[in-house]
A protein has these predicted regions:
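Hydrophobic/small residue at the entry helix of a nucleotide-binding pocket
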Residues: 87, 112, 179
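NAD(P)H dinucleotide-binding glycine-rich loop of Rossmann-like/cofactor-binding domains
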Residues: 28-107, 142
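Glycine-rich beta-strand-centered segment in the early N-terminal region that forms part
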Residues: 1-31, 50, 70-73
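Adenosine-nucleotide cofactor-binding segment
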Residues: 103-109, 121-183
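Short glycine-/small-residue-rich Rossmann-like dinucleotide-binding loops
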Residues: 10, 27, 153, 176-177, ...
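Short glycine-centered segments of the SAM/dcSAM-binding site in methyltransferase folds
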Residues: 21, 103, 126, 192-194
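Glycine-rich phosphate-binding loop and adjacent beta-alpha segment
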Residues: 123, 131, 176-211
Length: 211
């Protein structure tokens, strides 16, 4: 992710002038609406993947690959928005239609997870965080988490069900992937939503067709 200042512009550039504070976009070719693609060619041409990354003092990018940086944020804060911030927002608000009073379970304490925690709290949701660290769970509670579950000390899905009186979780931010998705399926409420964002434990899964 990038946050910086426009140094110079090329011919035909109209959206930015030298001196403008900008941040990068994660999908430079995806401006609005549904991404254009087909079953053989998925629309995942990202910065730092298909396009060059941003770990440099100077980079050359198309103007559509940039957005204006929020005036209320410094560069360090603004740089977290294009990937982590918008991923959490899109999952919970754009797609999830998050409402006050719903329950949100956030897995881990990484960038997407912490944004999801704060976005959910701002919308009036009850937030549960899972982590393998009691220290990180304590910090998550300071940021607004209602409950913390140490996933290394028991069955986190069962604990989540107990905390919701067996109703289950309305929104689960799934950042682990692999076999962990089985536990998310156990913990999610009827008509609930699982947003699969990370696959730290692997991309391969096997699930019961009866769940």
């Amino acid at each position: 992710d990038l946050a910086g200042v426009v140094d110079s512009i090329g011919e035909g550039v109209t959206r930015f002038q030298p001196g403008a504070r900008v941040i990068s976009t994660f999908f430079p070719e995806w401006i609005d609406g549904k991404p254009q693609a087909d079953a053989r060619n998925l629309p995942y041409r990202t910065s730092g993947g298909y396009f060059q990354g941003m770990l440099a003092e100077y980079v050359i990018v198309k103007e559509d690959a940039l957005a204006a940086s929020p005036e209320t944020l410094d560069d360090a804060e603004a740089s977290t928005l294009p990937c982590a911030g918008l991923t959490a927002w899109f999952a919970l608000v754009e797609r999830g239609q998050l409402r006050a009073g719903q329950s949100v379970l956030v897995q881990g304490t990484g960038g997407v997870a912490i944004f999801a925690l704060q976005i959910a709290k701002a919308h009036g949701a009850e937030v549960i965080v899972t982590s393998g660290s009691d220290e990180k769970l304590a910090l998550a509670k300071k940021l607004g988490a209602s409950q913390g579950i140490n996933r290394l000390k028991g069955d986190w899905a069962e604990e989540a069900l107990a905390l919701t009186q067996d109703r289950g979780i309305d929104h689960i931010i799934e950042t682990v992937g692999g076999e962990n998705l089985k536990h998310s399926l156990r913990a999610v409420a009827v008509h609930g939503r699982i947003s699969v964002i990370g696959v730290l434990a692997g991309s391969d899964i096997s699930l019961s067709a009866g769940r």
